[in-house]
């Protein structure tokens, strides 16, 4: 996973609340056996509407999604995060996230930045007044900058550390490879064991 420090991109106002993972990517798109190629399913039922925000320029090139409260609720499909990232999003800003979505985002390298609902409303207003407005998310300082507006965001310390270091679950495990191999070397032969990493 690539480390996340700062990201600047066009802000996309998604003025919808309670967006669940089935709305982010419907179940019909979950049949792939890889982690890529899910961008076509992102908001599929809404993208058939020509007036949907992702069908409008410059928002179709956005990488910072500003969503309503309770974004990513519902089932625990990692595909929702993968679809957002495959489309090009690197940051999602909301006043509340589904717990599982927030966890999946951090594990995949997508920043889920929690700001106040007043902050979300202000960002929507700024973006709609200046389509193409670039928004910067600074993870180290934990703030969002849009023009002259600076808003703090919340993220738990462990997820922030993982993102800053670029550590997914596999990378976290591999940091302890010496200890794992040492344990395996002393493990009795008659018990099941794992194969060494090639």
From Swiss-Prot:
The chain's disulfide connectivity reads none
User: What is one GO cellular-component annotation here?
Assistant: 3-isopropylmalate dehydratase complex
Pathway in which the depicted protein is active: Amino-acid biosynthesis; L-leucine biosynthesis; L-leucine from 3-methyl-2-oxobutanoate: step 2/4
Top enzyme class of this protein?
A: lyase
Swiss-Prot/TrEMBL GO biological process terms: L-leucine biosynthetic process
Q: Which GO terms describe its molecular function?
A: 3-isopropylmalate dehydratase activity
- Record carries keyword Lyase: yes
What is this enzyme's EC?
A: 4.2.1.33
Report the SUPFAM superfamilies cross-referenced here: LeuD/IlvD-like
Does the entry feature the keyword Lyase, yes or no? yes
Catalyses which reaction(s): (2R,3S)-3-isopropylmalate = (2S)-2-isopropylmalate
Q: Name one Pfam family in it.
A: Aconitase_C
Recorded hits in InterPro entries, A to Z, give:
3-IsopropMal_deHydase_ssu (IPR004431), Aconitase/3IPM_dehydase_swvl (IPR015928), AconitaseA/IPMdHydase_ssu_swvl (IPR000573), IPMI_Swivel (IPR033940), LeuD (IPR050075)
UniProt KW keywords = Amino-acid biosynthesis, Branched-chain amino acid biosynthesis, Leucine biosynthesis, Lyase
What protein family is recorded? Belongs to the LeuD family. LeuD type 1 subfamily.
Question: Per its database record, what is this protein's job?
Answer: Catalyzes the isomerization between 2-isopropylmalate and 3-isopropylmalate, via the formation of 2-isopropylmaleate.
Quaternary structure (record)? Heterodimer of LeuC and LeuD.
Protein name, entry field: 3-isopropylmalate dehydratase small subunit
Traced from the root, the source organism's taxonomic lineage reads:
Bacteria, Bacillati, Actinomycetota, Actinomycetes, Mycobacteriales
**Gene field:** leuD
């Amino acid at each position: 996973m690539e480390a996340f420090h700062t990201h600047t991109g066009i802000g996309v106002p998604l003025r919808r609340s309670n967006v669940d993972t089935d709305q982010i990517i419907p179940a019909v798109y979950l049949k792939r056996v890889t982690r890529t190629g899910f961008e076509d399913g992102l908001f599929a039922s809404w993208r058939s509407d020509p007036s949907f925000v992702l069908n409008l320029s410059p928002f179709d090139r956005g990488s910072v999604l500003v969503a309503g409260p309770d974004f990513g609720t519902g089932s625990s499909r990692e595909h929702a995060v993968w679809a957002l990232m495959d489309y090009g999003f690197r940051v999602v800003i909301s006043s509340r996230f589904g717990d599982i979505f927030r966890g999946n985002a951090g594990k995949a390298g997508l920043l889920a930045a929690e700001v106040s609902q007043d902050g979300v409303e202000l960002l929507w207003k700024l973006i709609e007044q200046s389509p193409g407005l670039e928004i910067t998310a600074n993870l180290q300082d934990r703030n969002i900058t849009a023009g002259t507006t600076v808003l703090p965001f919340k993220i738990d310390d462990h997820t922030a550390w993982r993102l800053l270091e670029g550590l997914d679950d596999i990378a976290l495990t591999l940091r302890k490879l010496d200890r794992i191999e040492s344990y395996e070397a002393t493990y009795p032969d008659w018990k099941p064991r794992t194969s060494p990493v090639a």
